[in-house]
Swiss-Prot record:
Its main location: cytoplasm. It comes from Saccharomyces cerevisiae (strain ATCC 204508 / S288c) (Baker's yeast). This is Protein farnesyltransferase subunit beta. Changing residue 362 to H: Can substitute for PGGT-I beta subunit, by modulating the substrate specificity for the peptide substrate. It comes from the Eukaryota. Pfam families: Prenyltrans (PF00432). Catalyzes the transfer of a farnesyl moiety from farnesyl diphosphate to a cysteine at the fourth position from the C-terminus of several proteins having the C-terminal sequence Cys-aliphatic-aliphatic-X where X is Ser, Ala, Met, Cys, or Gln. Required for the membrane localization of proteins such as a-factor, Ras proteins and other membrane proteins containing the C-terminal CAAX motif. The beta subunit is responsible for isoprenoid and peptide-binding.
Length: 431
């Protein structure tokens, strides 16, 4: 009996330390109710639990509420020209040594920066910059794809997704789209295909999850190489990634719901035109619950902190659901407040995660996409392709006069339609 008890205690300690990642025990604080408003229905005695997460949220919340209080009489506005300066400089200078870790994310940086410029103003991506992007990408992959994170690096689904997105923003300048090796990319996608319906992100060492599926389907749609061979088993894989919360995890049956994975799954279902194959009501509930009432922005998982990037990862998922007729599930005005008040800083250009954080290219792009979603309404014809999603300004919400974006692809609507139309006019077989 003592041995069993001992094993149970040891197992509990292991779970608490190794699996739950407790760095210190949960603290209990007794609240003195003598100073509490007796008119409110409260238990005679309550204990408030403290964790690293609750302490971190308290600090963020104090910063956010202070900003809202200080700026309450000021109409929020996007400081476009300030952010443009930050983005333009990236194409003119060598990036500092502390950004060496992004060496394997070169296509991503091109997409984040170029997309941010185009979302703020469709004319802000100059022809000279487009040519620089094209030259860089075809230096990474002289054959025209698939693309790695940099020259000499392994081809990767995420890098190829970012590269195709970046090329779509270049408006086929100098005929650059004809340099894309659609046949080579198609054969590579087939080689990444797994029996369970997923895709490895990299042929040699890649993982398999919902991100890989979304990247593969987005690439294939934009290049007009989507086939039944590519989509076989994908729907079943995605359905099994929706968990009891309503959102989607990375893999079937094993993960908690996460904003990034949920976006990848939702956008993939839109591309497959199979949104009705999942529990949409639970997905709407989960998406709505990610918006924090006090902060007004989104978090990515239950009991996590607000983060500007989820303005698109969760907000974009909600916009896709809205487009397909499932209604609006979050407060767009509140999200707009969070982005404009809390993700901008007067002294530093670019957009950021939350107050106290530094701006970066990643958060600049996804905060801007989230802002575009918050200021728009979405619709589409039943059974229509997701690239035909319609976007109209929401007249009840202020406008930053951003470019209309397609929430499925994270790109301006006109660029999505332009590249898809171009390759649909090119009737050559990808296989």
């Amino acid at each position: 009996m003592r041995q069993r008890v001992g094993r149970s205690i040891a197992r509990a300690k292991f779970i608490n330390t190794a699996l739950l990642g407790r760095k210190r025990p949960v603290m209990e604080r007794v609240v003195d109710i003598a100073h509490v408003d007796s008119s409110k229905a409260i238990q005679p005695l309550m204990k408030e639990l403290e964790t690293d997460t609750t302490e971190a949220r308290y600090k963020v919340l104090q910063s956010v509420l202070e900003i809202y209080d200080d700026e309450k009489n000021i109409e929020p506005a996007l400081t476009k020209e300030f952010h443009k300066m930050y983005l333009d400089v990236a194409f003119e200078i060598s990036l500092p040594p502390q950004m060496t870790a992004l060496d394997a994310s070169q296509p991503w940086m091109l997409y984040w920066i170029a997309n941010s410029l185009k979302v703020m103003d469709r004319d802000w991506l100059s022809d000279d910059t487009k040519r620089k992007i094209v030259d860089k990408l075809f230096t990474i992959s002289p054959s025209g794809g698939p693309f790695g994170g940099g020259p000499g690096q392994l081809s990767h689904l995420a890098s190829t997704y970012a590269a195709i997105n970046a090329l779509s923003l270049c408006d086929n300048i100098d005929g650059c789209w004809d340099r894309i090796d659609r046949k080579g990319i198609y054969q590579w996608l087939i080689s990444l295909k797994e029996p369970n319906g997923g895709f490895k992100t990299c042929l040699e060492v890649g993982e398999v999850d919902t991100r890989g599926i979304y990247c593969a389907l987005s690439i294939a749609t934009l290049l007009n190489i989507l086939t039944e061979e590519l989509t076989e088993g994908v729907l079943n894989y995605l359905k099994n990634c929706q968990n009891y919360e309503g959102g989607f995890g990375s893999c079937p049956h094993v993960d908690e719901a996460h904003g990034g994975y949920t976006f990848c799954a939702t956008a993939s279902l839109a591309i497959l035109r199979s949104m009705d194959q999942i529990n949409v009501e639970k997905l709407l509930e989960w998406s709505s619950a990610r918006q924090l009432q006090e902060e007004r922005g989104f978090c990515g998982r239950s009991n996590k902190l607000v983060d500007g990037c989820y303005s698109f990862w969760v907000g974009g998922s909600a916009a896709i659901l809205e487009a397909f007729g499932y209604g609006q599930c979050f407060n767009k005005h509140a999200l707009r407040d969070y982005i404009l008040y809390c993700c901008q800083e007067k002294e530093q250009p670019g957009l950021r995660d939350k107050p106290g954080a530094h701006s970066d290219f990643y958060h600049t792009n996804y905060c801007l996409l989230g802002l575009a979603v918050a200021e728009s309404s979405y619709s589409c014809t039943p059974n229509d392709s997701p690239h035909n999603i319609k976007c109209t300004p929401d007249r009840l919400i202020g406008s930053s006069k951003l470019t209309d974006v397609n929430p499925v692809y994270g790109l301006p609507i006109e660029n999505v339609r332009k590249i898809i139309h171009y390759f649909k006019s090119n009737l050559s077989s990808p296989s």
